[in-house]
Regions:
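Extreme N-terminal signal-anchor transmembrane helix of membrane signaling/transducer proteins, especially
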Residues: 3-38, 42, 46-47
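Membrane-proximal amphipathic alpha-helices
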Residues: 33-49, 55-70, 79-84, 173
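Extracellular/periplasmic ligand-sensing ectodomains of membrane signal-transduction proteins
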Residues: 96-174, 227-250
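Intrinsic low-complexity, intrinsically disordered coil/linker regions enriched in small/polar
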Residues: 115, 187, 201-286
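A short beta-strand signature within small-molecule sensing/ligand-binding domains used
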Residues: 173-182, 274-282
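Glycine-rich acetyl-CoA-binding "A-motif" of GNAT/NAT acetyltransferases
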Residues: 190
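Sensory beta-strand/linker motifs that couple input domains to effectors
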Residues: 194-196
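Single conserved hydrophobic/aromatic residue that forms the stacking wall/gate
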Residues: 287-296
Length: 296
């Protein structure tokens, strides 16, 4: 199956760099308090930003590995497009070969395979405890996937998309995110959305344990500002950095949130309950290659 590219590479790349600066969910903020002005030296600031940069780079690299897995699997999938009953081997391989990916599926446009009916979504999930892969075919009136965000948003945007984090339906309070890649035929028409879902546990655990100084604490927030980690666990996925700032009338925190969601890196000095405090923040940048679409 041949694909065509509709935009110049430079244009597509600039779109993706901008989009993922805002879309990637992982943003890190470390608040430092109980250090007076003399103790917060340029070395401390440089060291802290170095730690944040290293973690942001590590997270971006791991997210990129998910995209790479899907991109590489796409070519295998396209070579087997006429063998729908063999596609389970591809998605099972996806969840087995990338340690971040726990679920994967290929959601076809309605009635793509006439013999399969309106819905056809081969889907595989990995049980990390048993390392057993479960395969099933999804799609029904009760699971109308063409109307779901992970399918609809990349379809409308015509580019790959990382979902806002969500709790896994299977329970266990596992925060996940789904990467969706739209696939196009040689006429430039969408025929499927290839997805990979990952657990964010290792990212949130890493951030929660990050304490550059004894009196420091960290946040991990999504691109919409939702807390993915927080000292108060009741606020995780239930509040945003902005709702907390509003409730506490903390204008500095609101400013920090806006800076973070704008994709900026920086330092802000502010008063934190009469303590001279410093916020250090950065954003993960995810540079990704464009979806294989064709040039006309």
């Amino acid at each position: 199956m041949k694909h065509t590219f509709s935009h110049s590479f430079a244009t597509r790349l600039s779109i993706y760099v901008f989009s993922f600066t805002l879309i990637v969910f992982a943003t890190i903020m470390a608040l430092f308090y109980n250090y007076n002005h003399e103790k917060v030296t340029s070395y401390a600031i440089e060291r802290t930003h170095g730690l944040l940069s290293n973690i942001a780079t590590e997270i971006s690299s791991q997210l990129m590995s998910v995209e790479t897995t899907i991109n590489q699997s796409t070519w295998v999938f396209e070579r087997n497009i006429n063998l729908p009953d063999s596609l389970h081997l591809i998605i099972e391989s996806v969840v087995k070969n990338n340690p971040l990916i726990v679920k994967s599926g290929i959601a076809f446009t309605p009635n793509y395979y006439k013999e399969k009916g309106k819905y056809f979504m081969p889907y595989a999930s990995l049980d990390n405890k048993t390392n057993h892969v479960t395969y099933q075919v999804l799609g029904s009136q009760n699971y109308d996937y063409p109307c779901m965000d992970w399918y609809l948003i990349p379809k409308m945007q015509k580019q790959a998309y990382w979902s806002e984090p969500y709790y896994d339906d299977g329970g266990g309070n596992i925060i996940m995110s789904t990467y969706s890649k739209p696939l196009y035929d040689n006429r430039g028409e969408l025929f499927a959305v290839f997805i990979a879902s990952i657990s964010l546990t290792q990212f949130t655990d890493t951030i929660s344990l990050l304490k550059p100084y004894p009196s420091s604490y960290t946040y991990l927030i999504s691109r919409n500002g939702s807390f993915l980690t927080h000292a108060d666990r009741d606020k995780i996925m239930n509040e945003t950095i902005f709702s907390e700032a509003f409730a506490t009338e903390n204008h500095s925190q609101e400013q920090i949130g806006r800076e973070m969601l704008a994709g900026h890196t920086g330092t802000i000095r502010f008063d934190n309950q009469e303590n001279d405090s410093y916020a250090f923040y950065t954003t993960c940048l995810l540079y990704t290659s464009p979806s294989p679409r064709d040039s006309t």
